[in-house]
Amino acid sequence: MGMAAESQFHVLAVDDSLFDRKLIERLLQKSSCQVTTVDSGSKALEFLGLRQSTDSNDPNAFSKAPVNHQVVEVNLIITDYCMPGMTGYDLLKKVKESSAFRDIPVVIMSSENVPARISRCLEEGAEEFFLKPVRLADLNKLKPHMMKTKLKNQKLEEIETTSKVENGVPTAVADPEIKDSTNIEIEILPLQQDLLLVQQEEQTLSINNKRKSVEEGISTDRARPRFDGIATAV
């Protein structure tokens, strides 16, 4: 399995071919996606938190995993159509039948261009149907889903922030006023020092300007034709 940072758009890639898994993983990582790869539909359902039911004779019957099972959020599933055991179409149906995962976009891949197969998958709820080998241009079609997820996460963060503000600061935060005043004090001290420096510079500049004005006045007086005045007096 290939994993990356949790903050990225998370894609679950399902394919029984190691070559195709590596290819799709590299292409998705070029789009800054987090990628998890599995080699079968049953492993994909297990990763999502679904497991095969032991209480049923149906080999395709799946139930929810135990509560303590750690479920990683998946933003999109891309799966091969032809796989042994569980096909991509079967996986698509299982995902869409699940109340917890039906909103996850599912993309089907296949090396065979069969119109009836494509129509069946799209009617079942697949977002896209890509022909193999999948290219980067194909994955660019997934960008709207990435943007939708990003906006959804931003909205959830805003709701969470608003909820915290409405409910007040948790009691776990000790003496917020003292903490805030300390921070303000720390921030004000450098500011006061800067203001003092500015005032000192202004005073120095003012003294220099006055001195310059006096010197210019003296030099002007010195430049007057005193000898001419004496000569006239004579």
Curated annotation (Swiss-Prot):
Superkingdom field: Eukaryota
UniProt-annotated location(s): Nucleus
Gene Ontology biological process: circadian rhythm; cytokinin-activated signaling pathway; phosphorelay signal transduction system; regulation of DNA-templated transcription; response to cytokinin
Residues modified to 4-aspartylphosphate: 80
InterPro entries: ARR-like, CheY-like_superfamily, Sig_transdc_resp-reg_receiver
Function in brief: Functions as a response regulator involved in His-to-Asp phosphorelay signal transduction system. Phosphorylation of the Asp residue in the receiver domain activates the ability of the protein to promote the transcription of target genes. Type-A response regulators seem to act as negative regulators of the cytokinin signaling.
GO molecular function terms listed in the Swiss-Prot or TrEMBL record: phosphorelay response regulator activity
GO cellular component: nucleus
Full protein name: Two-component response regulator ARR9
A Pfam family assignment: Response_reg
SMART domains: REC
Organism listed in the record: Arabidopsis thaliana (Mouse-ear cress)
Assigned protein family: Belongs to the ARR family. Type-A subfamily.
Expression sites by tissue: Predominantly expressed in roots.
Keyword Transcription regulation: yes
Reported modifications of this chain: Two-component system major event consists of a His-to-Asp phosphorelay between a sensor histidine kinase (HK) and a response regulator (RR). In plants, the His-to-Asp phosphorelay involves an additional intermediate named Histidine-containing phosphotransfer protein (HPt). This multistep phosphorelay consists of a His-Asp-His-Asp sequential transfer of a phosphate group between first a His and an Asp of the HK protein, followed by the transfer to a conserved His of the HPt protein and finally the transfer to an Asp in the receiver domain of the RR protein.
Domain Response regulatory: 10-147
Subunit structure: Interacts with AHP1 and AHP3.
Keywords: Cytokinin signaling pathway, Nucleus, Phosphoprotein, Transcription, Transcription regulation, Two-component regulatory system
Major place of residence: nucleus
Keyword Cell cycle: no
